[in-house]
């Protein structure tokens, strides 16, 4: 299946767009950009992607690709989402921010959030969305890892990518 969509954004969010042409010189292995431009929700998401792309291009051998999955959430245009039961008792869809897939089939799902949301009952580290993805992780521990990155600034610190970089080099790590 091939889905097509038009990317729309508010004018005050234009700084959160990132195009393939902007990253071409830093992306010699052509990772990411399964649609163009990417329309990030926040500066930390954009910061994470740029840094992850740089890491992927340094160590590309085991990497299939990185996908920004948080920008297209319409179920008619994407088939990657996690269902979770909300506090209202109804089922809802959650589209995590990123998916990194290795050539051996192992995947790491990444969510980037503001530190403010760490304890949020829906979006937090132990929130309903995270628990739903961790349920997937438990079903497929040999193939799936889930990481949440919380930041109190407009960027993701380099050390916050350490678990993702370990995943790229060595595979899965379920230490927390």
Predicted regions and their residues:
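Electrostatic, structured charged patches in enzyme active sites and in nucleic-acid/phosphate-binding
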Residues: 1-176
């Amino acid at each position: 299946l091939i889905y097509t969509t038009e990317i729309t954004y508010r004018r005050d969010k234009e700084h959160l767009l990132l195009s393939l042409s902007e990253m071409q010189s830093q992306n010699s292995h052509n990772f990411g950009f399964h649609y163009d431009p990417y329309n990030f929700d926040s500066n930390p998401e954009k910061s994470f992607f740029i840094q992850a792309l740089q890491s992927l291009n340094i160590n590309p051998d085991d990497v299939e690709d990185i996908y920004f999955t948080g920008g297209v959430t319409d179920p008619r245009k994407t088939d990657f989402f996690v269902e979770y039961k909300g506090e209202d008792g109804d089922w809802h869809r959650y589209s995590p921010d990123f998916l990194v897939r290795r050539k051996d089939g192992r995947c790491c799902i990444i969510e980037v959030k503001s530190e403010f949301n760490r304890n949020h009952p829906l979006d937090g580290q132990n929130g309903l969305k995270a628990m739903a993805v961790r349920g997937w992780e438990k079903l497929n521990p040999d193939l799936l890892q889930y990481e949440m990155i919380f930041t109190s600034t407009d960027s993701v610190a380099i050390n916050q990518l350490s678990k993702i970089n370990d995943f790229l080099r060595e595979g899965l790590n379920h230490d927390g």
